[in-house]
């Protein structure tokens, strides 16, 4: 399983990669392996500001549906359109082409509430 060092992680198994004032958000390799085959990603919050820890969407696998929680407060700027036709990208490349949303980070200090790769791996 992969745990990239350049990301921050939530206890709910989301990751965030910050690039300036924006960030990409997805689910971890562990989360996708636990969920199994991803069949649909639903993010109804495009254009909305969602608080840290709040639900911004859901992810549906063959066997279950799980909420997606915001790692930091941010405005949802973009949803990964490739997931409409290929939701399995979340399984195949969770930290790359399988990203779920791009956000405008509202409070970078909230990143301090998240785990680094080592701390996240220790929770599994």
Q: What are these model-predicted stretches?
A:
Residues 1-58, 88, 92-124:
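Acidic, low-complexity mobile loops and tails
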Residues 61-64, 81:
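Short, conserved catalytic or interaction motifs in soluble domains
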Residues 22, 73-75:
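Structural motif
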Residues 37-38, 63-65:
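A short beta-loop-beta micro-motif enriched in histidine and acidic residues
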Residues 7-10, 67-73:
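Short coil-to-beta-strand transition motifs
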Residues 63, 69-71, 95-98:
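Short connector loops at helix/strand junctions that flank enzyme active sites
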Residues 76-92:
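Short, charge-rich, low-complexity interaction segments located
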């Amino acid at each position: 399983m992969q745990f990239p060092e350049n990301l921050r992680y939530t206890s709910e198994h989301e990751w965030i990669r910050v690039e300036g004032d924006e960030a990409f958000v997805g689910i971890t390799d562990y989360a996708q392996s636990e969920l199994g085959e991803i069949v649909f990603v639903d993010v109804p919050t495009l254009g909305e500001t969602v608080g840290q820890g709040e639900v911004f969407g859901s992810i549906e696998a063959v066997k279950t549906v799980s909420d997606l929680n915001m790692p930091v407060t941010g405005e949802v700027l973009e949803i990964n359109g490739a997931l409409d036709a290929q939701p399995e990208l979340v399984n195949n490349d969770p930290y790359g082409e399988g990203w779920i949303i791009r956000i405008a980070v509202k409070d970078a200090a909230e990143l301090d509430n998240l785990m680094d790769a080592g701390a996240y791996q220790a929770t599994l």
